[in-house]
Curated annotation (Swiss-Prot):
Gene Ontology MF, one: carboxylesterase activity
Family: Belongs to the type-B carboxylesterase/lipase family.
Enzyme's top EC category: hydrolase
Keywords: Hydrolase, Serine esterase
InterPro entries for the chain: AB_hydrolase_fold (IPR029058)
Organism of this sequence: Drosophila mojavensis
Domain of life of the source: Eukaryota
S-S pairs: none
Protein name (Swiss-Prot/TrEMBL): Esterase-5
Listed EC numbers: 3.1.1.1
Catalytic reactions of this protein: a carboxylic ester + H2O = an alcohol + a carboxylate + H(+)
Chain positions covered by the region annotation Disordered: 1-38
Coiled coil location: none
Length: 38
């Protein structure tokens, strides 16, 4: 199915793997910032 097909986007800092989940995109392996504390 289309939801199982991997999607790879090449960015200046590297590649990001994700999936097209029929209506929204899900990205994997993107580093996230730490939550604000205080």
């Amino acid at each position: 199915s289309a939801a199982a097909d991997p999607l790879i986007v090449e960015l200046p800092n590297g590649k990001v793997r994700g999936r097209d989940n029929e209506g929204y995109y899900e990205a994997e392996g993107i580093p996230r910032a730490e939550p604000p504390v205080g």
